[in-house]
Amino acid sequence: PYEGMAFDEYISKFPQAVSPQFSSLDKFPILVKFLDVEKPISIQVHPSDENAGPGEEGKAEAWYIVSANPGARIYYGLKEPITKEQLKQHALAGTLEQVVNQAPVQPGQVWYNHPGILHSLEGGALVAEVQQNSDTTYRVYDFNRKDAQGNLRELHLEKAAEVIDYTPQQGAEKAIQSKKAGANALSALFSCEYFKMKRLDVETRIELCCKEESFQCLLFLEGKGNILFAGERFAFQAGDCYFLPAGLGAYEVEGAC
């Protein structure tokens, strides 16, 4: 009955697939996507739900580093305390990189870009991103890139200056390193008030369960295999993402991933 149905139509018709509390008028709470980073992402910040501007929404996100070239690095938070005016001066002078932490990234790391944290990524990396379903981004420095008309892309310095977390960060110490928990294992990876991330390792087969309180998304980063449910097999390979409705119950994953 769902074949050919767009995802937004599906959750509108079957809101209980998201959670018992979800309404057909609600916005799906998260986005799951890949970022293929070659050129630097602009140094940016996202507001929280509390300090987002009129008509805007907060945005928290987590990056899982799938692969990274030698030299790939993240920009993450301020090195030392500075004022709003100093921050804007650095952004306009093109010297913001001098006051932002930089750290190498490695496959298996999780970086939590909480609302207010200055962040960017460069040097060649594939990232699996989980985020609040929001596109609110305040661009602070864009490495002097130009748009199709040859103009420097717009910055959002006034908005950014009001929401930035000015607490100095410690760079690489903020990374969570993912580790394999076993041959067939599901282990906790990262949790915040907006979403939870777990690591699934499968060498043969594992039994899992999707309970009534929430949906699950299975994002496969490597390997191939099948999801087994109610006597059916649903094939997957690296890059596939499956939505499992709340209350689905017991299912299995077989293969290698």
Segments from the language model and where they lie:
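An exposed, glycine/acidic-rich loop-and-rim segment of catalytic or binding clefts
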Residues: 93, 99, 110-112, 117-172
